[in-house]
Amino acid sequence: MAKGIIHYEVGEQVDLFLLIKSATKGIASNGKPFLTLILQDKSGDIEAKLWDVSPDDEERYVPECIVKVAGDIHNYRGKLQLRIRSIRPAHPGDAVRIDDFLEKAPLGREEMKAKVMEYIFAMENPNIQRITRYLLKKYEKAFFEYPAATKNHHEFISGLAYHVVSMLELAKALIHLYPSLNKDLLYAGVILHDLGKVIELSGPVSAAYTLEGNLLGHISIMVSEISKAAEQLGIQGEEVVILQHLVLAHHGKAEWGSPKPPLVKEAEVLHYIDNLDAKITMIDRALEKVKPGEFTERVFALDNRSFYKPAFLSVSKPKNPGSKE
């Protein structure tokens, strides 16, 4: 099996097919245009610069384009980059498909769907359950295909659903520890909090922000969707407002993009488990790229910190002296 792009080290030569995840135009200090490419395979992605680009290059090297790249890995300001020596678009004779380069959630869609439905069926409040089921059914296909973000966390196929399933497991554990939490509100909040991303983002591959995503954002989108769902189902009452509040408050603070701070206990918990799952995922993905005893590259979304991968954790545990093995 070929080595994934994130497992290459500084100085290693690269000669392989990759998928363009994003392409951003810039102007160099010499006044010439260049492209910042994010290139990916199933292991993850890496940044590369394509210098002195022509108008044809700008049209040729776009998101969802498979390219054959040769070059080497170097360290730029604490982050690995692919220095391009040659690049060309793939052609039919190369026998490569976009699906060959897409990272996917560790769980299959049907397995995740079964898990999400299990939590919906556990809800006892009929209004909360009906609104949640209605919205999930309305956006089911996209929910189980889309990433949770364009970068930073769960930015892979079915990442949104995988993020939700992980959060539901966290919510279940916390409800066991703190029985005063209302499971209906917390489970519904987990399922709905990021559902607006199926409108905010363009699709499961090379996701970008849509017009609605740029002008409204997933939080405002889902608050509106909850209101429309309640009206369609003939549901009135406090549950509707609190579900909207859970979505509005899940980023925690205004400076983190939250229109309201959490003012309901379940909203506070939702914020913490959302934050925890996202951050653990970011750290894990950074640690996957380094060997034991090394620091990761800086993680911008985590205050630009580098994380250490303890060397002792990779050492096999000594056998128990009393063991017969």
Curated annotation (Swiss-Prot):
CDD domains associated with the record: HDc (cd00077), YhaM_OBF_like (cd04492)
DNA bind region: 14-90
GO molecular function, one term: DNA binding
Alphabetized Gene3D superfamilies for the sequence: Hypothetical protein af1432 (1.10.3210.10), Nucleic acid-binding proteins (2.40.50.140)
SMART domains recorded: HDc
Gene Ontology biological process terms from the UniProt entry: rRNA 3'-end processing
InterPro entries from the UniProt entry: 3'-5'_exoribonuclease_YhaM, HD/PDEase_dom, HD_domain, NA-bd_OB-fold, NA-bd_OB_tRNA, YhaM_exoribonuc/phosphodiest
The UniProt record lists the keyword DNA-binding: yes
Domain HD: 163-279
EC annotation from Swiss-Prot or TrEMBL: 3.1.-.-
Name of one Pfam family that matches: HD
Domain of life: Bacteria
Keyword ATP-binding found: no
Disulfide bonds: none
Keyword annotations of the record: DNA-binding, Exonuclease, Hydrolase, Nuclease
Family membership: Belongs to the YhaM family.
PANTHER family reported for this sequence: 3'-5' EXORIBONUCLEASE YHAM
Function: Shows a 3'-5' exoribonuclease activity.
UniProt protein name: 3'-5' exoribonuclease YhaM
Record organism: Geobacillus kaustophilus (strain HTA426)
